[in-house]
Amino acid sequence: MSFFETLADRIEATDSVVSVGLDPDPNRLPEFLANADLPRWAFNRRIIDATHEHAACYKPNAAFYEDADGWRALEETIAYAHGKDVPVLLDAKRADIGNTTRQYAAALDRADAITVNPYLGRDSLQPFLDREEKGVFVLCRTSNPGGSDLQDLELASGEPLYERVAALADVWNGNDNVGLVVGATAPEELAEVREIVPEIPFLVPGVGAQGGDAEAAVEHGLADRPDAAVDVGLVNSSRGIIFAGEESSRPDDEATYFGAAGDAAKRLKKRLNQYR
């Protein structure tokens, strides 16, 4: 079964397009986990327990795991999410040349999908694209303020760079496993990209702490795929869900802290479902 078939089934089962970003910043982990063997894994396990009923996908960002204990925590996290029947999208933004990118693609042995950077061109992404059963989300129009520095540059053809990336992603989609990363903080561009690629699912970050447009994220981020009973795509929130406990009534109480994350995921699911 392909990633997007798995994702469609999960969206239908949970009635949710929420992607929960698992970015366990060590500087923000609650004090009551300080003595855990692997604090990031201990944190993620509790977040998954609290949110899995509302999660279509989990999206760990590789930057928060790039040390020996971190990779162990990531492996445990992926296995635990799979145990809850939730697919995992590794947010690694990988790409390189030749043998290097083949090694990066090996990371997909555990995760179900990955984010990649198109700047080096198709050959840098080919080892990912060749994994037919895995999802490959290509950075297109990102949610960060500096995204426009390069992505909005006008090409000789008159189109902005992000539109060319979307068109190329469609060409690269021979295995029907390509998605695009398009931020909710750029709703007009989100709509434009959807017109270019009507059947490619988007990963839409930026609706949480970054304050992106939730309605546009749903209207344009979800693809109407002929092989799926539901529209397919993901709307991600990371800090807005996993650190919701910091603003809870009892942030030092474990049940209250992680209960707040579950409530935040449920609220986002309900908010997004208004527009589905």
Swiss-Prot record:
Keyword Lyase attributed: yes
InterPro entries given in the database record? Aldolase_TIM, OMPdecase_AS, OMPdecase_type-2, OMPdeCOase_dom, RibuloseP-bd_barrel
Q: Which PROSITE patterns match?
A: OMPDECASE
In alphabetical order, the GO MF annotations are: orotidine-5'-phosphate decarboxylase activity
Q: Where is the active site?
A: 93 (proton donor)
For this UniProt record, the keywords arranged alphabetically read as follows: Decarboxylase, Lyase, Pyrimidine biosynthesis
Q: Name one GO biological process term.
A: 'de novo' UMP biosynthetic process
Top-rank taxon, per record: Archaea
The enzyme's main class, written as a single word, is lyase
- EC number(s) per entry: 4.1.1.23
Biological pathway:
Pyrimidine metabolism; UMP biosynthesis via de novo pathway; UMP from orotate: step 2/2
Reactions this protein catalyses: orotidine 5'-phosphate + H(+) = UMP + CO2
Q: Which SMART domains does the UniProt record give?
A: OMPdecase
Entry's SUPFAM superfamilies? Ribulose-phoshate binding barrel
Record has Lyase as a keyword: yes
A Pfam family name for this chain?
A: OMPdecase
Q: Which family does it belong to?
A: Belongs to the OMP decarboxylase family. Type 2 subfamily.
- PANTHER family linked: OROTIDINE 5'-PHOSPHATE DECARBOXYLASE
Fetch the NCBIfam families from UniProt.
Answer: pyrF_sub2
Q: What is this protein called?
A: Orotidine 5'-phosphate decarboxylase
Q: What is the lineage of its organism?
A: Archaea, Methanobacteriati, Methanobacteriota, Stenosarchaea group, Halobacteria
